């Protein structure tokens, strides 16, 4: 496999913590899940420290920062607290995401175009802390161009609408939007990642898009792990997207 069609897998372990928080126990441990994921071939570990702390906790992030052998992709809202926290932890990668307390999960991309000054200031702070910053955005030209203007070196395209498509035609349309977004991002010199709602039956089509650097996948892996074990679930997803990227 050449660098041109190499693809990375970021494993999101948020929902291991969701299961733990459901009963307020100390198990299952998302840190152990992260280490198992690395052993199974994950190229990075993604965690989202939400304002309401519904799954990942501050301590999880601190421990992960010390023990990960790959790299952390730290998802966070654009708040003063989170910026300060990231400056302390200094994760390798930070992905800025939109966040509201009422949402079940992240519902859409960050509106970079509508708040360029605020996002640019956050990108600058995080970059000075040694973090590579990506912006979680919809596959829209105006948002991609805004991401470039604010100084982010990378974007993560929101694949939720593709994942939630009700018909094959709708899925094809959304996949086309993602493909166009990848091309646009690459043309603007950005690293292009993608994620949200991807699983074992829909990730291949996204992985096959030329130029995709990394897919971030979590819920599907955690769910599949209930039946096959965490390492096996990660290994299967890694093999699936690598094969798709090679064919694509």
Swiss-Prot record:
The keyword Metal-binding does not apply. InterPro entries: Aldolase_TIM, PyrdxlP_synth_PdxJ, Pyridoxine-5'_phos_synth. Its main location: cytoplasm. GO terms for cellular component: cytosol. PANTHER family: PYRIDOXINE 5'-PHOSPHATE SYNTHASE. HAMAP family: PdxJ. This is Pyridoxine 5'-phosphate synthase. It comes from Ectopseudomonas mendocina (strain ymp).
């Amino acid at each position: 496999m050449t660098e041109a069609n190499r693809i990375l897998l970021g494993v999101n372990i948020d929902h291991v913590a969701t299961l733990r928080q459901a009963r307020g126990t100390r198990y299952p441990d998302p840190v152990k899940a992260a280490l198992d994921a690395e052993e199974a071939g994950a190229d990075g570990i993604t965690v989202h420290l939400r304002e309401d702390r519904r799954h990942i906790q501050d301590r999880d992030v601190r421990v992960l920062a010390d023990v990960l052998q790959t790299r952390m992709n730290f998802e966070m809202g654009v708040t003063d607290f989170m910026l300060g926290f990231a400056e302390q932890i200094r994760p390798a990668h930070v992905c800025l995401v939109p966040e509201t307390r009422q949402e079940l999960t992240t519902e859409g991309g960050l509106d970079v175009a509508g708040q360029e000054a605020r996002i640019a200031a956050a990108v600058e702070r995080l970059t000075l802390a040694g973090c590579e910053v990506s912006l979680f955005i919809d596959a829209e030209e105006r948002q991609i161009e805004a991401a470039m203007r604010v100084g982010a070196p990378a974007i993560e395209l929101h694949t939720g609408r593709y994942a939630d498509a009700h018909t094959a035609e709708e899925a094809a349309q959304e996949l086309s939007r993602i493909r166009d977004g990848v091309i646009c991002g690459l043309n603007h010199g950005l690293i292009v990642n993608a994620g949200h709602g991807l699983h074992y039956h829909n990730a291949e089509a996204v992985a096959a898009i030329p130029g995709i650097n990394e897919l971030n996948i979590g819920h599907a892996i955690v769910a599949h792990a209930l039946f096959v074990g965490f390492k096996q679930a990660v290994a299967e997803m890694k093999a699936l997207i690598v094969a798709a990227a090679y064919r694509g």
